[in-house]
Amino acid sequence: MKKLVSLLLVAMMALSFIPAMADEPVEIIVACKSLGNGWPAVLEDDFVYQKILEETGVAWKLILIDDYFAAMGQRIVGDDLPDVIYYSDSYLKTYADEEVLLCLDPYVEKELAPVMAWLGDTNLIPYQVNGELYGLPKLHDGNKSQYNIQIRKDWLDNLNLAVPTTIEELYNVACKFITDDPDGNGVADTYGITGGKGLPLFHAISCAFDTALGNYILIRDGKVTNALLQPGMKNALEWCLKFTQTENMVDPDVLTTTGNNIAIAGSVGIHVNSWPGMFKQYAQDNIAAVNPNAKWIPAGPLHNEMGGEDVMYPINNVGGGDGWALCADLADDEEKLQAVFKVLNYYVTEEGSNLIQYGLEGDHWVRNPETGRITMTENGAAANYISTYQIFSRIELEYLQVKFPEAEVAFTNSMTNGVLEYYNSLIVEPDGMYLADMESYIKTQMLAFIYGERPLEEYDAFIKELNDLYMFDEYMEAAADQLIAYGYDVTK
């Protein structure tokens, strides 16, 4: 009898666990190459995770994988894949070809219908492999460029100069900033121009000739071409050389260090860079601490000397590049698959979208009941880590207006500028080609031309070197074939 009672008690205890087990959330692992600054050390402090769990019943866990692509290769071999997989550049095709990704086409019209409606007219081509959709598309809501030509307006006023709009005007204003004591301290201690670390300054110059200093695949007049082959490239290099060969014109450290520090210090009056480094509140505070009268304004792009659209900077505006995809194993686990769809569809609700952009309403942000506009609270900085959750990207202009209202004049300028749109993210190089080696060689030679270490008369020889040594001509042939296959109305 005692044995029977014991068995009944065990059975009752087991039954008591069934509802709890049934209520256990479905766990989805989202693999990440990096996590946002200030990422919570424990899930209990990750309010986005907690809110998604509360609203969907899904444990949506973002995890950092060190040495990401090498580790993913090992996971593929070991059949130990996360549910949502980060990729970049050609890895989307690599993973799809290795059959580790789920084709999304069967789910577009039903399970992912809310997502597709939210994405609007976003181009799906960059997220396809062999005509099938594998990558989760990112919202395309216009130009997301951050670059502009930033100029000391108070220096222009001191010297009675206008904001430059052409390459020649930019050069002349920069010369005046060197020679005419724009800060009024009686000392010749200023440079003409600086930029973001590397080539941003020289990209702005070259964009005045409808080109940029690197391997950028372009479409011009219905044909696939490359920035290196643009008719204005030699003119662009001549102007870059003119800038570098003028004494005190170019910040000597521009290739290795961003010009933000010398711009804030008052040592230069023109800065070609992305807007956050000079227009976010912390930067404005630093500028004011050095010189309360300093006033930086955004400008550009320069007039296109080749007759086309004025463009500021080379931008991958066609999509692709990096993103997330779903593991093929989800096709065999309906519960997990539906859990993923549930979270993705929550992402594109008003509540979900606001959560992953701004944080929790009432804690990190509030909405003005009259205007409907969102503003961040004093605790808004606690939501700075959440950008990694933005799998579908974000509504950029609205986001920037909420997060950085102090910089609206700068990001409005950069986002309304024309850009040099390139298509590299869609192209897979031919077998046997080492693209990274070619691009490294291109960069060294561009710098040699810019700084007078290689004569411009050798530019045609440089292109021949790319063809002979790096399969550049075959690469361009492949680019044309692939863009045609994607459905672009272009010819070789």
Predicted feature residues:
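Positively charged n-region of N-terminal signal peptides that target proteins for export
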Residues: M1-V5
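Extracytoplasmic/secretory soluble proteins
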Residues: L9, F17, D23-K492
